[in-house]
Amino acid sequence: MVNSPQNPRQDQRQDLDLTSFSATGGEPVEWRISDAPVPYPEAVAAMEARVAAIAAGEAPELVWLLEHPPLYTSGTSGKDSDLLDPRFPTFATGRGGQLTYHGPGQRVAYIMLDLKRRRPDVRAYVASLEELILKTLAAFNVRGERREDRVGVWVKRPDKGDGYEDKIAAIGVRLKRWVSFHGIAINVEPELSHFAGIVPCGVADPRYGVTSLVDLGQLVTMADVDVALRQAFEELFGPTRALVPEAAA
């Protein structure tokens, strides 16, 4: 989930204080949306460049919303044995976590924030990303929940049986010089069968599957989700400024 400086705190994430991530002063966070799918290597190169610029004080913070063409990514805890059917390109990545799928219909938000200026607390930052997802889902009357033993945000599925839950959003974070990158992925309307090519995030228990907003009966568009995501982000992290250009660097 996180590849970062060491942080010894062991509080449950739901109990962590999330109130101090809104920076005072400074520029609003740039908010950028790419309409066309962005190849993964291109996105990583752009993030790396932007993170270096933020750390050097040469660029403002950035949230970059995009979709990828179908692909799998493997985090620092990824296992080759969890790649069951490599039907799409697979990329090793420096973020925390294991294997996941990205593709059209999934809103990826790459979040590049200066945590040294805001609050250098890794676990609380991850909890704040969970809260960002929870608030976004709540805008569509979907109750997401944290799980201390499983990464991401989950929804209960009593229609499938007792104890069944589906993952609706993933989190994977990396830090360089206390600047965050990578981020979150919310399933809006992806092709859920593509997750069958992997063991998503290493969770093999058949009670735990994958879902999306549309799969749950919420007829929402990507634009709807973007509006809710931005509102939730500003509640947690402060003001944003929309940009038209698509390049993240």
Curated annotation (Swiss-Prot):
Keywords: Acyltransferase, Cytoplasm, Transferase. It is an enzyme of class 2 (transferase). Gene3D superfamilies: Bira Bifunctional Protein, Domain 2 (3.30.930.10). Residues 1-23 are annotated as: Disordered. PROSITE patterns: BPL_LPL_CATALYTIC, LIPB. Pathway: Protein modification; protein lipoylation via endogenous pathway; protein N(6)-(lipoyl)lysine from octanoyl-[acyl-carrier-protein]: step 1/2. GO terms for biological process: protein modification process. GO terms for cellular component: cytoplasm. Its EC number is 2.3.1.181. GO terms for molecular function: lipoyl(octanoyl) transferase activity. SUPFAM superfamilies: Class II aaRS and biotin synthetases (SSF55681). The active site is at residue 201. It comes from the Bacteria. Coiled coil: none annotated. Residues 57-241 form the BPL/LPL catalytic domain. The record marks 167 as: Lowers pKa of active site Cys. It is found in: Cytoplasm. Substrate binds at residues 95-102, 170-172, 183-185. Pfam families: LplA-B_cat. It catalyses: octanoyl-[ACP] + L-lysyl-[protein] = N(6)-octanoyl-L-lysyl-[protein] + holo-[ACP] + H(+). HAMAP family: LipB (MF_00013). Catalyzes the transfer of endogenously produced octanoic acid from octanoyl-acyl-carrier-protein onto the lipoyl domains of lipoate-dependent enzymes. Lipoyl-ACP can also act as a substrate although octanoyl-ACP is likely to be the physiological substrate. Belongs to the LipB family. In the reaction, the free carboxyl group of octanoic acid is attached via an amide linkage to the epsilon-amino group of a specific lysine residue of lipoyl domains of lipoate-dependent enzymes. This is Octanoyltransferase. It comes from Bradyrhizobium diazoefficiens (strain JCM 10833 / BCRC 13528 / IAM 13628 / NBRC 14792 / USDA 110).
